[in-house]
Swiss-Prot record:
Protein name: dTTP/UTP pyrophosphatase
GO CC annotation terms, alphabetical: cytoplasm
Enzyme Commission code: 3.6.1.9
HAMAP family listed in its UniProt record: Maf
Family matches, as CDD domains: Maf (cd00555)
Catalytic activity: dTTP + H2O = dTMP + diphosphate + H(+); UTP + H2O = UMP + diphosphate + H(+)
A Pfam family per the record: Maf
Family that this chain belongs to: Belongs to the Maf family. YhdE subfamily.
Keyword rRNA processing: no
Length: 193
């Protein structure tokens, strides 16, 4: 298995790659996550951002496997990225309260040695419990809402908001491991030998 360059500073993606024992190093992308400037469906926008992140790092390293990913939350056709501030986080959590939403991760794998680009996405459906204002404000005060699409961490305290999940759990954490495994196999890279 060749070493992967993760084009992300996300500690959650780092943890997920460590979980499946992949050899990797981290070189974060400098790309601004400005999804509103992109065109297409939410899934296509997530794919485009994952590609931009991978391409940015590929231009720096010029060889090997580069992994880019971008996770967004979609509810009622509205894309929720990372909250800008407490008010933004509050509004996002209020929208998610008692409803089902989509978590979409665009994933891009660039094999620079063989000039192959794989770009895909994974969608997981997450249903939230009803959240009262007190719970939302306490969660925001904890600090966990920040730096995460949709203002919650399903692998943290935010798990108490999740009533149900349809699809890939690791996708809502930030990286769909099953999809990544399939993409690596297309490049003849085996996670399990």
């Amino acid at each position: 298995m060749r070493n992967i360059v993760l084009a992300s500073s996300s500690p959650r993606r780092k943890d997920l790659l460590e979980q499946i024992k992949l050899p990797f190093e981290i070189i974060p992308s400098d790309i601004e996550e400005n999804i509103s400037e992109l065109s297409g469906t939410p899934a296509k926008k997530a794919e485009q951002l994952s590609y931009q992140k991978a391409r940015d790092v590929a231009d720096k390293v010029q060889k090997g496997l580069i992994l880019g990913a971008d996770t967004i939350v979609v509810i009622d056709d509205e894309i929720l990225g990372k909250p800008k501030d407490s008010e933004d986080a509050y509004n996002m959590l209020k929208k998610l309260s008692g409803k089902e939403h989509e978590v979409i991760t665009g994933i891009c794998l660039l094999d620079l040695d063989n000039k192959i680009e794989l770009i895909q996405h994974e969608t997981t459906f997450v249903k939230f419990i009803e959240l009262d204002d007190e719970k939302i404000k306490a969660y925001i005060k904890s600090g966990e809402a920040f730096g995460k699409a949709g203002s919650y961490a399903a692998q943290g305290v935010g798990a108490i908001f999740v009533k149900g999940i349809k699809g890939c759990y690791s996708n809502i954490v930030g990286l769909p491991l099953n999809r990544l495994g399939n993409m690596l196999e297309k490049l003849n890279e085996k996670i399990i030998k």
